[in-house]
Amino acid sequence: MKTQFVILMITVILMQMLVQTEGGILGKLWEGFKSIVGKRGLNDRDQLDDLFDSDLSDADIKLLKEMFK
């Protein structure tokens, strides 16, 4: 009975260590993914939002339309 209890306690401790380590690893992977994609990539944005920017001139819009034909 004592042996089973010791094995159970060691298993519980190892499982807790695994869960804490996995959370750290998954957290770091998620941070890396977010830094690669960036803020705009994770937002639900239309790709044509820049066309409505007031800083774009008519020539810029014409060039963009030619590029995407």
UniProtKB/Swiss-Prot annotation:
Residues 1-23 form the signal peptide. It is found in: Secreted; Target cell membrane. One of its GO terms (biological process) is defense response to bacterium. Coiled coil: none annotated. The keyword GTP-binding does not apply. GO terms for cellular component: extracellular region; membrane; other organism cell membrane. Belongs to the non-disulfide-bridged peptide (NDBP) superfamily. Short antimicrobial peptide (group 4) family. Amphipathic peptide that possesses relatively strong activities against Gram-positive bacteria and a fungus, but has very weak antimicrobial activities against Gram-negative bacteria. Also exhibits very low hemolytic activities against human erythrocytes (64 uM induce 21% of hemolysis). This is Pantinin-1. It comes from Pandinus imperator. The lineage of its organism: Eukaryota, Metazoa, Ecdysozoa, Arthropoda, Chelicerata.
